Amino acid sequence: MARVTVQDAVEKIGNRFDLILTAARRARQLQLNHREPLVPEDNDKPTVIALREIEKGLINNDIMDAQERQDALMQHQAEDAAVSLLTA
């Protein structure tokens, strides 16, 4: 079992409440296979992986927001392409 010290992660995010929200959001992405881990998994649970990513500065809310905007844009473009094929 991995032990994670969250003090460094708190310093990256700002406060422990935002850290909890950010780590939960990232862990959900990892668990549902929407994203690949940015650190070695080492047989850790998604929450531990999320905390390690945050601690290393690889993930924060701004990064996840940008990824989600990019995903939404790509999905919108794919839907537009599908509609244009159906109406052509």
From Swiss-Prot:
Its EC number is 2.7.7.6. It is an enzyme of class 2 (transferase). One of its GO terms (cellular component) is DNA-directed RNA polymerase complex. Gene3D superfamilies: 3.90.940.10. One of its GO terms (molecular function) is DNA binding. NCBIfam families: rpoZ. Belongs to the RNA polymerase subunit omega family. Promotes RNA polymerase assembly. Latches the N- and C-terminal regions of the beta' subunit thereby facilitating its interaction with the beta and alpha subunits. This is DNA-directed RNA polymerase subunit omega. It comes from Actinobacillus succinogenes (strain ATCC 55618 / DSM 22257 / CCUG 43843 / 130Z). The lineage of its organism: Bacteria, Pseudomonadati, Pseudomonadota, Gammaproteobacteria, Pasteurellales.
